[in-house]
A protein has these predicted regions:
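Face-selective signature of the C-terminal outer-membrane beta-barrel domain
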Residues: 239, 243-253, 288-454, 485-487, ...
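A beta-strand signature from Gram-negative outer-membrane beta-barrel systems
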Residues: 122-165, 745
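Gram-negative outer-membrane beta-barrel transporters
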Residues: 165, 425-432, 441, 551-575, ...
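C-terminal beta-signal and adjacent terminal beta-strands/loops
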Residues: 502, 657-664, 687-746
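Extracytoplasmic beta-strand/coil segments of soluble accessory domains associated
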Residues: 37, 71-108, 128
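Membrane-embedded beta-barrel scaffold of Gram-negative outer-membrane proteins
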Residues: 300-304, 308-328, 487, 493-499, ...
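Transmembrane beta-barrel wall of Gram-negative outer-membrane proteins
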Residues: 175-204, 213-260, 293-304, 361-366, ...
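Short acidic/polar hinge/loop motifs at secondary-structure boundaries
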Residues: 107-134, 184, 234
Length: 746
């Protein structure tokens, strides 16, 4: 056994032993590999010196038609991704313990503001496949220090097709415990042009936990209960000639609360102060409804013979409006807390840009990928406050507009980058790759009157206030990567990879904070966090990876050990949810992998994927466990599948493990360790192919386990006591839920 591991992972032994193994495996032949467009170099997974996963349409359909949400499906199938919080957003969901970038057809959905709505972006009905690159990457700029997800949409076919889907699920917890979905798409064309138009709609009802109690609506990141989702998407392809092609993707997406249901906070906000229990109510009357609304358009031109090179050019535009749930703010001191205001924020982003990528092969052994990227983003946010007296009397059910203020400083972000990536085949076994990306980023921050001071002026407690000065700042970053890939056989590769990632922390939560003194009705600015005095520093991550993959007829596996080190850390100020950037280094290391086995001459299959992870921060020269506010727990999933004839059955399990810390080192004299408890869920998914169409069925949380989600354990740490009782933010997982779905393609 030792020799086998040394042979796989030691480069010196690889050079001596791999030629023999290559010759022995020639007869087997290599399985066709899907090209990963997210690599920007038209390479397949077998040609990449980095952990890469491709979730194909059959896997997506099995999970989604079995009732899984996009976030839940990804957490089940991507080893390095954290478990889902089951809410609207992916806040707190990391890859390999760090932030991830999400794209649709190569257009990134991440903005400078870390709003975490990237996975509240598309109905899975419109997804063809999903590409995943684990670990830090600079292929598409900053923000992907933990990994990259590229959602590839369905495109039109030459032959005429109609696709229909209808389904629903329920836990039989009450009359409102039911979700429904319906979707339709039509596509067609000819040799020169094709297109697809789709409309999908999802309605969510109430959710109940394993004990039959209704799950509270998430009033922090907003929940999915009692909401609706509409996704309208059109794609078109025009083949100009044998080498040139145009592709167009347009989308309108809206996911929003139904406007009738909300969180009852008790008379005089008794549930906020801990004197009563909150519960969901259907009597909401609010002037602001939480949700996500997005428009996206993407035009791509490709030419496979541009001066002897492959050329891909993209121009794109995205705008989005993110609205949050009405949120109380406490004042006073324990035990005499009281609610001083209740409001809801709305944040708007406009984003446009372009990319140019060329792939060339100057000589047979050398492949070059190079190009330029340019992007511009503008951001603004406001906070709508509601009539406090009416909100108190109704327990937060009657929310009439009283006044509005700015929530964060408005700003723009511009990026201009060039990159060069090279891949050289040293011999039939070894491929050396490396590259560099240089990116220039400019931030322009507007002047901003402090958030609390704006409230005081709006309520008449003050007449004026100094503005915290804005300004302009820029960043210059050169990010490098290098890798060595060894083709042990046609079916087996091992690699070592080094890559750098970069992120600029959330400027909205960093700038615009100040200390004021009230003098005669005027707030005088004493000190502040501003561009001139305290520039927001970027965070660079160095990531290392040693991996191995094997793709056989029966056994398929990919395993990688990883280590990443960042030069700084982000800390959350729980009094106002702003951030600080500290000089504390952060290291994250672990083992990520997946194993699938298809039993020979059988309809059975089994598999597992896992991510064993540890996160640490260096404080005062000593490595400590990363606080559970942001630390990722280890995770393992497993499944058994049986697919005889027209049947396809799957039993799958997901286990997340405990994660703990040594106390909140951002607070003085804090030594009490904290823990997020792990839990296990079991799902049964199945389908049967009918003479016309397919029927899918599922039982999620098969054992009806009662548990608190990772986010439901993390939210009280972040929001309580500043924003109310911890019970207000303790979100349970959904109990046993039955699903039924019918789909047909003709």
């Amino acid at each position: 056994m030792k020799r086998k591991h040394l042979w796989v992972l030691n480069p010196c032994l690889l050079a001596m032993l791999a030629p023999t193994a290559w010759a022995e495996d020639q007869k087997a032949g290599a399985e066709e590999q899907m090209v990963v467009s997210a690599s920007r170099s038209h390479r397949s997974t077998a040609e990449m010196a980095q952990t890469t996963w491709v979730i194909e349409s059959q896997e997506i359909e099995q999970q989604v038609q079995g009732g899984k949400e996009l976030k839940d499906m990804l957490a089940q199938l991507i080893p390095g991704m954290d478990v889902s919080g089951q809410g609207r957003t992916n806040y707190g969901m990391n890859m390999r313990g760090r932030s991830m970038m999400v794209m649709i057809d190569g257009v990134r959905l991440n903005s400078s503001r870390s709003d975490s709505r990237q996975l509240d972006s598309i109905d899975p009905f419109n997804i063809d496949h999903i590409e995943v690159i684990s670990g830090a990457t600079s292929l598409y700029g900053g923000g992907s220090t933990g990994g990259l997800i590229n959602i590839v949409t369905k495109k039109g076919q030459q032959e005429q097709q109609v696709e229909l889907q209808v389904g629903g699920k329920t836990g039989f917890g009450g009359h409102n415990d039911h979700d429904e979905n319906v979707a339709a798409a039509v596509s067609g064309g000819n040799d020169n042009a094709s297109g697809r138009l789709s409309v999908s709609y999802q309605r969510y009802g109430g959710w109940y936990d394993g004990k039959g109690n209704e799950v509270l609506i998430d009033n922090t990141q907003t929940g999915l209960q009692y909401s609706n989702r509409l996704d309208v998407m059109g794609t078109g392809t025009l083949n100009i000639d044998d080498h040139q092609q145009l592709q167009l993707t347009t989308q309108y997406y809206k996911s929003q609360s139904d406007g009738d249901h909300g969180l009852f906070l008790g008379e005089n906000f008794a549930a906020v102060t801990g004197n009563a229990k909150a519960y969901n109510s259907g009597n909401l009357n609010s002037d602001r409804i939480p949700g996500t609304e997005r428009h996206l358009i993407n035009l791509q031109y490709s030419n496979t013979d541009f001066l002897g090179q492959d050329l891909v050019a993209q121009v794109y535009y995205r705008d989005e409006t993110l609205t949050f749930y009405p949120f109380p703010t406490l004042a006073g001191k324990a035990p005499n807390y009281y609610v001083s205001s209740i409001g809801a924020s709305q944040q708007k982003t406009d984003f446009y840009g372009g990319k140019l990528t060329l792939n060339s092969k100057p000589v047979d052994a050398l492949t070059l990928t190079y190009g330029i990227d340019a992007e511009h983003e503008s951001f603004n946010a406001n906070q709508q406050f509601f009539n406090l007296a009416k909100a108190q009397q109704s327990g937060g059910m009657t929310l009439e507009n009283a006044y509005s203020t700015g929530r964060y400083p408005s700003y723009t972000t511009s990026n201009l980058a060039s990159f060069l990536q090279a891949s050289y085949d040293i011999n039939p076994i070894f491929t050396l790759s490396g590259g560099v990306r240089y990116q220039y980023t400019e931030n322009k921050i507007d002047d901003f009157v402090g958030y609390n001071q704006q409230q005081a002026i709006a309520t008449g407690a003050a007449t004026s206030a100094d503005a915290i000065p804005g300004g302009k700042t820029d960043y210059n970053n050169a990010l490098f990567n290098a890798g060595l890939l060894a083709h042990l056989t046609e079916r087996q590769q091992t690699w070592f990879n080094f890559s750098q990632g970069f992120e600029i922390p959330d400027p909205g939560k960093y700038y615009g904070n100040g200390t004021y003194a009230l003098n005669g009705g005027h707030y005088q600015l004493l000190k502040s966090v501003n561009v001139g005095d305290s520039k927001l520093e970027g965070i660079k991550v160095n990531a290392y990876e040693l991996g191995w993959r094997y793709t056989g007829d029966n056994l398929r596996t990919q395993i990688a050990a990883y280590y990443s080190l960042s030069d700084k850390s982000i800390a959350i100020n729980k009094t106002d949810m702003t951030i600080n950037v500290n000089a504390d280094k952060r290291r994250i290391y672990g083992l990520e992998g997946a194993v699938d086995y298809f039993f020979e001459d059988s309809d059975w299959s089994a598999g597992t994927n896992f991510n064993v992870i540890r996160s640490e921060t260096k404080v005062n020269g000593e490595w400590k466990k990363l606080v559970v506010d942001t630390a990722s727990p280890s995770k393992v999933t497993a499944y058994v599948g049986w697919a005889p004839g027209d049947w396809n059955l799957r039993l799958q399990s997901q286990q997340t493990f405990d994660v703990s810390d040594d106390g909140d080192y951002t607070k003085a004299n804090s030594t009490q360790g904290r823990k997020i408890d792990g839990y296990n869920t079991l799902d049964f998914l199945g389908s049967y192919t009918l003479p016309v169409g397919k029927i899918s069925f599922s039982v999620e949380n098969l054992l009806d386990k009662e548990y608190t989600t990772v986010w439901g354990q993390r939210a009280p740490i972040l929001y309580s006591p500043t924003y109310g009782s911890p019970e207000l933010y303790s979100y349970k997982g959904r109990g046993r839920t039955f699903g039924l779905n019918y789909s047909v393609l003709f």
